[in-house]
From Swiss-Prot:
Protein name: Aspartate 1-decarboxylase
Signal sequence extent: none
Top EC class, one word: lyase
Organism per entry: Anoxybacillus flavithermus (strain DSM 21510 / WK1)
Superkingdom of the source species: Bacteria
Length: 127
């Protein structure tokens, strides 16, 4: 049996743009993707801390070092520039690997730079 577990999380990223007329997805700085192990075209869940919206889309790599977090297409209706979001990817893990699975979490600063990189969810996330 497999369980769906969090594989990676980008916590408290700031939306830099919302582009309604682009063909779907979220554009994320490729340096940030590499740091947490997310990949282009990967399905992700987006949580908007400002309005509570939760939705799914897929990743498009953005310019390295840009700090870009741009919601494209219909998803642009669910965010505004400067909203704080969480981006989460999931993975299917077999029962025998459940205790050894370690997700990567990037805690972002107000300029979309990685403030802290954690391997495994902290016991309490109060920021």
């Amino acid at each position: 049996m497999f369980r769906t577990l969090m594989n990676a999380k980008i916590h408290r990223a700031r939306v830099t743009e919302a582009n309604l007329n682009y063909v779907g997805s979220i554009t994320i700085d490729e340096d940030i993707l590499d740091a947490v192990g997310m990949v282009p075209n990967e399905k992700v869940q987006i949580v908007n801390n400002n309005n509570g919206a939760r939705f799914e889309t897929y990743i498009i790599p953005g310019e390295r070092g840009s700090g870009v977090f741009c919601l494209n297409g219909a998803a642009a209706r669910l965010v505004q520039k400067d909203d704080i979001i969480i981006v989460i990817s999931y993975v299917l893990v077999p029962e025998e690997k459940l205790t050894s699975h370690r997700p990567k979490i990037a805690i972002m600063d107000e300029h979309n730079r990685i403030k802290e990189l954690i391997v495994q969810e902290p016991a309490a996330t109060v920021l």
